[in-house]
């Protein structure tokens, strides 16, 4: 999501591929995948210090919104 990251591409790609593989293994449809990833996101944020939660949530929402392709023909 971010353009500049403190994580290297290999670390990011490995984790993302593991998550995609798990969703594919369970043949999770889009709605179930989003529910699981949403709950995972919530658990990660709730594990942070309470004072940080609101700010990180807002940054996450902004990054997610910016990364979604809003064209009607996008796939």
Swiss-Prot record:
InterPro entries: UPF0352 (IPR009857), YejL_sf (IPR023202). It comes from the Bacteria. It holds the Pfam family DUF1414. Belongs to the UPF0352 family. HAMAP family: UPF0352 (MF_00816). This is UPF0352 protein AHA_1665. It comes from Aeromonas hydrophila subsp. hydrophila (strain ATCC 7966 / DSM 30187 / BCRC 13018 / CCUG 14551 / JCM 1027 / KCTC 2358 / NCIMB 9240 / NCTC 8049). The lineage of its organism: Bacteria, Pseudomonadati, Pseudomonadota, Gammaproteobacteria, Aeromonadales.
């Amino acid at each position: 999501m971010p353009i500049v990251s403190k994580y290297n591409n290999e670390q990011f790609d490995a984790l993302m591929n593991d998550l995609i593989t798990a969703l594919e293994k369970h043949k999770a449809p889009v709605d179930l995948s989003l529910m699981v990833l949403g709950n995972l996101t919530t658990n990660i944020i709730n594990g942070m210090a309470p004072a940080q939660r609101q700010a990180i949530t807002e940054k996450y929402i902004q990054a997610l919104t910016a990364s979604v392709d809003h064209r009607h023909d996008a796939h």
